[in-house]
Amino acid sequence: MAPPSTTHSKEERAARRIIEILMSSMPDRMELNKIKHKVSEEEGLEKVLKDYEILRYLKEDEMKTGIVNLLVGKKVRSASGIYTVAVMTKPSRCPKDRPCSYCPGGVDYGTPQSYLGKEPALMRGIQSNFDPYRQVMYRLTQYSTLGHRPSKIQLIIMGGTFPATDLDYQEWFVTRCLEAMNDYPEFKPYRWRSLEEAQLRNESSRVRCIGITMETRPDWAKEHHTDRMIRLGATLVEIGVQTLDDETLMRVNRGCTVKDVKEATRILRDSGLKVGYHMMPGLPGNTREKDLEDLRRIFSDEDFRPDYLKIYPTLVIEGTELYAEWLAGRYRALGNDEAVDLLVEAHKNFPKWVRVARIQRDVPAHIIRDGVTKSNLREIVDARLRMLGIRCRCIRCREVGLARVRGEDVSNLRPEIKVEEYAAGGGIELFISLEDQDFLVGFLRLRVPSERAHRPEVIGAGVIRELHIYGPQIPVGEKSREAYQHHGLGATLLSKAEEIARDRFGLKRIVVLPGVGVRGYYRKRGYRRLPSSPYMMKRIAQ
């Protein structure tokens, strides 16, 4: 008897036919679309099968073939070797008496401070009632639906100054995020676990947290704040710097100073954390020249020199104090063309050891009363740079995974180790990279801390602040000939860092503050957890 002609069986038959064709011919993207149209029509489907629908019918042995790379959506999501999962904390009040003049949202609006309710991450948070477990689980499920296999997760905690929230809430929030990764793909009933239990489970989980990003104000990144963030598992801390002009900071009611920025940067860096800056060109009182000088000074002045950078041109949003100034004619924001000109000029001076992660906030244009409304500002800036024959030297523009997504030929690279040394915050930084033809395959950040470092674990030791191998994310325990992960390149960089720490600086120990999901990686390479500490240490004396 013939099988029932249901939509499901039609879809499965069509998907299997397409998979069999792909297994035998491996066409390009254009040919794939033709095949999908032809088979979908022949099987009587009302619509053309989508890539993720075909992926549902892949067999286990087919999951490791080139078919997955052809069908997976949004390859840029994992091109840097990891997946990001952004989660939003519940709305809470600004930690100071009055929000900054440009800052929208807040408890009275039902959103975290500085958010509008229309940002994708916030909308996911609202839909989940700000439940961290559900936010992480839903995001991982979204990735899987698109054909991805999320295994290494950089958790990004958004929603304002996280260290200013209730301490018990901070611990509960991070614990539940980790538990979602530990339980995935199965939603499980709530069960109380301590932070330490959740971290221990994640060391061997299918989905591992390789790092946690937290946002804070400079005056909420003192030594005791930093210690709390480290205990929670933070590996990258993003600071709302905005500008390096104290008068402008006072004018917008920022409530902190440039001195706070310098101190926070040093404390975080000395503790082994990565440091990111948020900068806001176009603030009231700042000129184009002053904005450009800020974007140059954060790299020329050794008191700053962040590892990561996000640039958010100032926007006028209804309901803010700045909106009232704009209505009264006392303020005008940077327009699209002005912002592009400024950013193109700034890109000329970005060093090779910074990653420019974003240059625009994710805000719908219809909400913006004045300011940059182009949603593709980064693409416009990149196109202008190419037209001028300028290649940005930042990490993001050179990393091999994104180069492959852009269609550049990276098939025959023979990366070599390069070392760049620079002073920062009273200590010494070494950017140890694997490069070829200016393509960046991976890097390691090694620090010799300043004399003011407060964490006992780092005193007298070299500190590995970051180790990253680029290219498509390869799940834990697997290998791919087409990718750079899991081929010993990380171990090569580690060995070089240990050699430099020992031979160049005479250090006898090297420590690292790894994400909880990466502890096993370092353990295999001779690192051991220090007693009652999240740090891992290896002796390197001859």
Language-model features: locations:
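Conserved acetyl-CoA-binding loop-helix of GNAT-fold acetyltransferases
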Residues: S480-I500
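Conserved acetyl-CoA binding element of GNAT-fold acetyltransferases
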Residues: V458-Q485
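Flexible, acidic/Gly-rich N-terminal and inter-domain linker regions that tether
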Residues: M1-Q135, R139-K188, K352
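Conserved active-site alpha-helix within GNAT-family acetyltransferase domains
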Residues: P514-K538
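C-terminal accessory regions of radical SAM enzymes
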Residues: R330-R445, E451
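Conserved GNAT acetyl-CoA-binding A-motif
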Residues: I500-P514
